[in-house]
From Swiss-Prot:
Function: IGPS catalyzes the conversion of PRFAR and glutamine to IGP, AICAR and glutamate. The HisF subunit catalyzes the cyclization activity that produces IGP and AICAR from PRFAR using the ammonia provided by the HisH subunit.
Active site per the UniProt annotation: D12, D131
Protein's name according to its UniProt entry: Imidazole glycerol phosphate synthase subunit HisF
Name of encoding gene: hisF
Quaternary context: Heterodimer of HisH and HisF.
Catalytic activity as recorded in UniProt: 5-[(5-phospho-1-deoxy-D-ribulos-1-ylimino)methylamino]-1-(5-phospho-beta-D-ribosyl)imidazole-4-carboxamide + L-glutamine = D-erythro-1-(imidazol-4-yl)glycerol 3-phosphate + 5-amino-1-(5-phospho-beta-D-ribosyl)imidazole-4-carboxamide + L-glutamate + H(+)
Pathway per the UniProt entry: Amino-acid biosynthesis; L-histidine biosynthesis; L-histidine from 5-phospho-alpha-D-ribose 1-diphosphate: step 5/9
HAMAP family found in the cross-reference section: HisF
Length: 256
């Protein structure tokens, strides 16, 4: 039987408020994270992802207090990321109520940290977040590069090869954001989504660019992702999670 595909609302949190930007800039406020998470829990979201988008840039630790409040209200898996640099950071987040922890910038500077985290806590709770940007020109073989620090710093790392390396070190899941598409609302970058999904044996979550329900289905059917993540289409009331599930089911996708 086909595994159900997951729909994951994403909360980008900046100083305790949910925000949404375009290509990682031009931020607008979307509300209180705990209230928003509770709404998605009631709507039947499969999981929730909470990313403290200020953490890596400012060197701040993810807001444990907000995670604790959220975990007390939300009874679906909660992935938390942002500024995760040490095993103790992961332990603190899991103790606060996170089910999975997302590692981004720290994985690039110290790949062995991913292996250490997977050994300590189990691959099932270690997510590696990849922010990728297309760097190949027209007519060239498609190539995507990893960026860090909230999409500000290029690394020179090839996104597909990097994702394979992370799987080898023990990551249980890849959260893949296309920086070219983020907040643009014209669909996922299906090229990089498919390239990484097809190269790996672990689930890939597609992120960055959802503007309508067709985009969610395309991420699964054309991007071969295991799960799709969206923010603004849910936060600002354009669509609900049940509407998204009904549409995906109508396209022949197995949903919970």
């Amino acid at each position: 039987m086909a595994l159900a595909k997951r729909i994951i609302p994403c909360l980008d949190v900046d100083n305790g408020r949910v925000v949404k930007g375009v290509k990682f800039e031009n931020i607008r406020d979307a509300g209180d994270p705990v209230e928003i998470a509770r709404r998605y829990n009631e709507q039947g979201a499969d999981e929730i992802t909470f990313l403290d988008i200020t953490a890596s840039v400012d060197g701040r630790d993810t807001t444990l207090h907000t995670v604790e409040r959220m975990a007390s209200q939300v009874f679906i898996p909660l992935t938390v990321g942002g500024g995760v640099r040490t095993v103790q950071d992961i332990r603190n987040l899991l103790n606060a109520g996170a089910d999975k922890v997302s590692i981004n910038t720290a994985a690039v500077f110290n790949p062995e940290f991913v292996g250490e985290a997977a050994d300590r806590f189990g691959s099932q709770c270690i997510v590696v977040a990849i922010d990728a940007k297309k760097v190949s020109g027209p007519g060239e073989t498609p190539r995507w590069e990893i960026f860090t620090h909230g999409g500000r710093k290029p690394t020179g790392l090839d996104a597909v090869e990097w994702a394979k390396k992370m799987e080898g070190l023990g990551a249980g899941e890849i959260l893949l954001t296309s920086m070219d598409q983020d907040g643009m609302k014209n669909g996922f970058d299906l090229g990089v989504t498919r390239a990484i999904s097809d190269a790996l044996g672990i689930p890939v979550i597609a992120s960055g660019g959802v503007g309508n329900l067709q985009h969610l289905a395309d991420g699964i059917l054309e991007g071969h992702a295991s799960a799709v993540l969206a923010a603004s289409i849910f936060h600002f009331g354009e669509y609900t999670v049940p509407e998204a599930k009904a549409y995906m089911a109508s396209r022949g996708i197995v949903v919970r």
